[in-house]
């Protein structure tokens, strides 16, 4: 199996956009998830001075859902108030750049739009920076990760009918050190956000 670290994807199922986030961690596997209002958070449970291991992972508004591996979740969501998704990703990822930790961890981000078959991915690494606007494909996900994924890849997913089922499907991916997964799906008049993972 491959270790991809923080992993996220955007796609289309039954004509509706979805997004997911998968936390794989070797150094800090003891985390918990908190879903509150229009946001979801990953909270570290191990004592550390590392500022990057607790963060908002999902933030939604009326039109968009944002999924990332860090504090840039909220900044991208705020930028979407006045900017289109591509520009929001470019501006925020360029400003915040990669994480200044021992691994120079890249910042990754995904955006989906209500009622749309278009999505956006972004990546800010030490030696690589890109933002892509993508036409989503039915039953597929475009996936990027902090490690061991070259750009982004296309994956097929089994059918699901809820954000929780999506999170369970993501946990079945053959990746190392999986801790928890979040699913984001378009529901009636809102975004649904659910989490699945090992109990703490």
Which residue ranges define each predicted feature?
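Conserved short alpha-helical segments that host acidic/polar catalytic motifs at enzyme active sites
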Residues: 1-200
């Amino acid at each position: 199996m491959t270790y991809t670290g923080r992993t996220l994807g955007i796609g289309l199922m039954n004509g509706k956009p979805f997004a997911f986030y998968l936390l794989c961690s070797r150094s800090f596997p003891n985390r918990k998830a908190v879903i509150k209002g229009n946001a979801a958070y990953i909270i570290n449970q191990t004592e550390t001075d590392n500022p990057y291991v607790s963060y908002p992972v999902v933030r939604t508004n009326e039109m968009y859902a944002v999924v990332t591996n860090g504090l840039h979740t909220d900044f991208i969501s705020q930028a979407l108030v006045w900017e289109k998704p591509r520009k929001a990703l470019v501006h925020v990822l360029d400003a915040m750049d990669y994480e200044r930790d021992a691994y120079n961890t890249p910042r990754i981000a995904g955006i989906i739009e209500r009622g749309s078959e278009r999505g956006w991915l972004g990546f800010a690494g030490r030696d690589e920076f890109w933002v892509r606007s993508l036409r989503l494909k039915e039953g597929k996900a475009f996936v990027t990760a902090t490690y061991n994924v070259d750009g982004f890849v296309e994956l097929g997913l089994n059918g699901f009918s809820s954000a929780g089922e999506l999170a369970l499907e993501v946990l079945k991916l053959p990746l190392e050190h999986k801790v928890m997964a979040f699913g984001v799906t378009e529901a009636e008049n809102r975004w649904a956000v659910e989490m699945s993972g090992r109990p703490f």
